[in-house]
UniProtKB/Swiss-Prot annotation:
Organism, scientific name: Arabidopsis thaliana (Mouse-ear cress)
Pfam families: Med25_VWA
Role, per record: Component of the Mediator complex, a coactivator involved in the regulated transcription of nearly all RNA polymerase II-dependent genes. Mediator functions as a bridge to convey information from gene-specific regulatory proteins to the basal RNA polymerase II transcription machinery. Mediator is recruited to promoters by direct interactions with regulatory proteins and serves as a scaffold for the assembly of a functional preinitiation complex with RNA polymerase II and the general transcription factors. Positive regulator of shade avoidance and of jasmonate signaling.
Gene this protein is translated from: MED25
Any one biological process term the GO annotation gives: red, far-red light phototransduction
Family classification: Belongs to the Mediator complex subunit 25 family.
Region (Disordered): 260-285, 435-466, 518-547, 731-836
UniProt biased composition (Low complexity): 731-818, 827-836
Expression induction or repression: Down-regulated by methyl jasmonate and by infection with an incompatible isolate of a necrotrophic fungal pathogen.
Major localisation: nucleus
Protein name: Mediator of RNA polymerase II transcription subunit 25
Phenotype on disruption: Late-flowering phenotype when grown under long-day conditions. Increased drought tolerance and sensitivity to necrotrophic pathogens. Increased resistance to hemibiotrophic fungal pathogen F.oxysporum.
More about this protein: The affinity between DREB2A and MED25 is reduced when DREB2A is pre-bound to DNA.
Length: 836
């Protein structure tokens, strides 16, 4: 038998828009398809004669954002090498425009070997192509090469036209059916343009699409060609084989840890409520990034019976808080583990299925992170109770897939009010209550004819996935319980987050927007979680801050929903759709006049939002991007913020560390005024000047106080000055009196001397002319004069000590002297009477 050559080309988008979803796509879809395609394990048989060739094509976007438009690899037959190529793709670039999907598909068509002349059966094609993209294709036709066909159009000379032609992506996709190549698509978003590409590449437009397992990734668009038998078998083998009338539980998942060699000891097997569990190999799983998921209830009735799920492994948790082992079957690789993606956390679609009795088993969920952005100061609060996302309840003859309605949502309201969300099957009900009290250790036990295993509380509150629970979650740590009380026999299904001990849960990269009006969130009285990223289903919650549940209204209110657009070459380009939330304390008319589309006018550095001081009041808002875009990643990488001019406000928009989360600062008016930033030296100088001014003010105050004191002391000073002036006047009068007395004394002495000289001269004449008697008579006046001079000498002697005393005691003796001076006459001499 001749060897058959089978070819598979993976055409992947290389921009940053696909980067967050790539690991999920590789682990959940591509790896399964490739291994099934290379092994050909159809119906348990292996076909050794087939030869497999694998290749990779990477396309980017038009413009200057990407260095290369299309890249291709060679052909390889080694599966591991090809998987290594897939895991080594570096995503980056992109922009506002669409991607070059047409060029990538055309390159893949040209790489395939030309079709042989013999027509191949449509259900047994050997050449396949898988398109992986997260962006819309370029809408304008571009020059691409297309392969030659037997019935191609010919020119005037009759030669086949194989030159470059203008074609869009849908036109190129239509050539796949003509070239006997199956076209399948995997898109992490529900894009209508990608579905149109798949429909254009279908050989039979009337054929119905096959049901593909999208339970893990709710919003993923996975369309596998019916002619790609190996891919359909690989994905249907891991699916639940549910009827088309039943919607599987939809959980958006992302990055999955690669398989790791078997290590550690397997935990003790746990008996199931519906039968024993087969022996499975314990597998240790590496750290996985996690995130929270929104729960939205829905009800489906009248479901047909379904077979059991032997491929979904059970989860057992050891009593210790170390990283546990996960039991999984050998037929299901570890990459099938369900983990949450922090960057894309859409709705969980729970269903209520009646009329089914087969045993249900759960797959090993990843660690759950409940990271809630409650306010703009980045205060993170999380639920302080168990968050169950996917438990199944066996009630009589029905199996109920139950989801806790108290999970933190992504910003969309639930279908029922929080206090009225009820899951019912007609016989038993599982009621989600917005309770206001602490979870009690016991509750009403539902009447269930099925097997009920007592749920015994443990110190670590271990919950096995396959335990039949007849009591509502005993053994929880004391604290706020934001979950629902479950009644009836419950068999835990997918994504059970157990382990309510004293531990921590890793705070991953994604936080969920609080849903307005949902009371079960219990945003008050709960603490932040922190811990280790683990793919184990253990969820250890920190001790709550209060012993009773506290219900509170949401701190954010949705005020706006619209489009965010930019400009490219003067034309507006849609970036993403936004939802705006304001604080509950902000004004109701904050976004009253906002337009449906916000236009970015320019980009500025993010430092303006973090380090600047603004004049006036700024309101903070939180925005949620409905879809991820490469432009938002560039804003975060380059630390830029967008300036949006609103009718009467200015909005500065920056991307936060959380996926699809944007922070806005809203300013009134059409411009933002910054306070000038002053360098340190100038600040020091200003401080010095301020100190100097303070010192001057203190000095002025002191001077004012002194002046005030002086004003108070002025009367005393004036009195002292008057007294001093009086003293000076008295001293002056005394000096004048002394001078006058001296003059009088001198005059008297001169007169006396003159009289003496006259008397002496007259006496001499008398001696010469008269006898001795006359001379004696004449001497008597002389004696009399001498006697008169003696009192005068006495007065001079008395005045000298008085002048000395007056130098120090002039004030005391001044009145007496003034009376003496006021007499004006000669002093009374005690010797005057003696002369008479």
């Amino acid at each position: 038998m001749s060897s058959e050559v089978k070819q598979l080309i993976v055409v992947a988008e290389g921009t940053a828009a696909l980067g967050p979803y790539w690991q999920t796509i590789v682990s959940d879809y591509l790896e399964k398809i490739i291994r099934s395609f290379c092994g050909s394990e159809l119906n348990g048989e292996r076909n050794p004669v087939s030869t497999v060739e694998l290749s990779l094509v990477i396309f980017n976007s038009h413009g200057s954002y990407c260095a290369c438009l299309v890249q291709r690899s060679g052909w390889t037959r080694d599966v591991d090498i090809f998987l290594h190529w897939l895991s080594s793709i570096q995503f980056g670039g992109g922009g506002f425009n669409e991607v070059a999907t047409a060029e990538g598909l055309a390159e893949a068509l040209m790489m395939f070997s030309p079709p042989s002349g013999q027509a191949q059966p449509s259900n047994d094609l050997k050449r396949h192509c898988i398109l992986i993209t997260a962006s819309n294709p370029h809408i304008l036709p571009t020059p691409v090469y297309r392969p030659r066909l037997q019935n191609v159009e010919r020119n005037e000379n009759g030669d086949a036209q194989a030159e470059s032609r203008l074609s869009d992506a849908e036109t190129v996709a239509s050539y796949f059916a003509k070239c006997s190549v199956s076209l399948s698509v995997v898109c992490p978003k529900q894009l209508p343009t990608i579905r149109a590409l798949y429909n254009a590449g279908k050989p039979n437009q009337q054929s119905a699409d096959l049901s593909i397992d999208t339970a893990k990734n709710t919003f993923y668009l996975v369309l596998i060609s019916e002619n790609f038998v190996e891919a359909c078998a690989a994905l249907s083998h891991s699916a639940t084989n549910l009827p088309q009338t039943q919607s599987p539980v939809k959980v958006d998942r992302a990055t999955v840890a690669p398989s790791i060699p078997v290590t550690g000891q397997p935990p003790a097997p746990v008996s199931s409520a519906n039968g024993p569990i087969q022996n499975r190999q314990p597998v240790s799983v590496g750290p996985v990034p996690t995130a929270t998921v929104k729960v939205e209830p829905s009800t489906v009735t009248s479901m047909a019976p379904v077979p059991s799920f032997p491929h979904i492994p059970a989860v057992a948790r050891p009593a210790t808080q170390a990283i546990p082992s996960i039991q999984t079957s050998s037929a299901s690789p570890v990459s099938q583990d369900m983990v949450s993606n922090a960057e894309n956390a859409p709705d969980i679609k729970p269903v209520v299925v009646s009329g089914m009795t087969p045993p249900l088993r759960t797959g090993p969920p990843g660690g759950a992170n409940v990271n809630l952005l409650n306010n703009l100061s980045q205060v993170r609060q999380v639920m302080s109770s168990a968050a169950l996302a996917g438990a199944a309840s066996s009630v009589g003859q029905s199996a109920v897939a139950m989801h806790m309605s108290n999970m933190i949502s992504t910003g969309m309201a639930t279908s029922l009010p929080p206090s009225q969300t009820v899951f019912s099957t007609g016989q038993q009900g599982i009621t989600s209550m917005a309770g206001s009290g602490a979870l009690m250790g016991s509750a009403q036990t539902g009447q269930s004819p099925g097997p009920n295993n007592a749920f015994s509380p443990q110190t670590t509150s271990n919950v096995a996935s396959n335990l039949g629970v007849s009591q509502p979650m005993q053994g929880m740590n004391q604290g706020s319980h934001s979950g629902a009380m479950m009644q009836g026999g419950i068999s835990m299904n997918q994504n059970m987050m157990s382990g309510l001990g004293q531990g921590n849960v890793s705070s991953g990269t994604g936080g969920m927007m609080p849903t307005p009006g949902v009371g079960q969130q219990a945003q008050s009285g709960i603490q932040q979680l922190g811990g280790s990223n683990s793919s184990a289903p253990n969820m250890q919650l920190s001790q709550p801050s209060s012993g009773a549940m506290q219900t509170s209204q949401s701190k954010y209110v949705k005020v706006w929903e619209g489009n965010l657009s930019g400009q490219r070459q003067g034309q507006p380009v849609l970036i993403t759709r936004l939802e705006g939330y304001r604080s509950a304390s902000a004004s109701d008319s904050l976004a009253a006049n906002w337009p449906p589309t916000m236009q970015i006018v320019r980009l500025i550095s993010q430092d303006h939002m973090n380090n600047k001081q603004y004049v006036g009041k700024a309101d903070f808002l939180v925005f949620r991007a409905m879809s991820q875009h490469g432009f938002l990643g560039q804003l975060q990488d380059k630390k830029l913020c967008a300036v949006i001019q609103l009718p009467s406000q200015t909005l500065l928009l920056s991307v936060s560390d959380k996926a699809c989360r944007l922070i806005g600062m809203l300013f009134p008016g059409d411009m933002v005024v910054f306070k000038p930033q002053i360098p340190n030296q100038q600040q020091q100088q200003q401080q010095q000047l301020h100190q100097q001014q303070q010192q001057q003010q203190q000095i002025q105050q002191q001077q004012q106080q002194q002046q005030h004191l002086q004003q108070q002391q002025m009367p005393q000073l004036q009195q002292q000055q008057q007294q001093h002036q009086q003293q000076q006047q008295q001293q002056h009068q005394l000096s004048q009196l002394q001078h006058h007395q001296q003059q009088q004394q001198q005059q008297q002495q001169q007169q006396q001397q003159h009289q003496l000289t006259q008397l002496q001269h007259h006496h001499q004449q008398q001696q010469q002319a008269s006898p001795l008697n006359q001379m004696q008579q004449q001497t008597s006046p002389l004696n009399q004069m001498q006697q008169q001079t003696s009192p005068l000498n006495q007065m001079q002697q008395q005045q000298q000590p008085q002048q000395m005393v007056m130098g120090g005691q002039a004030f005391a003796q001044a009145p007496g002297r003034s009376q003496q001076g006021g007499g004006g006459g000669q002093p009374n001499m005690p010797g005057a009477g003696f002369m008479g």
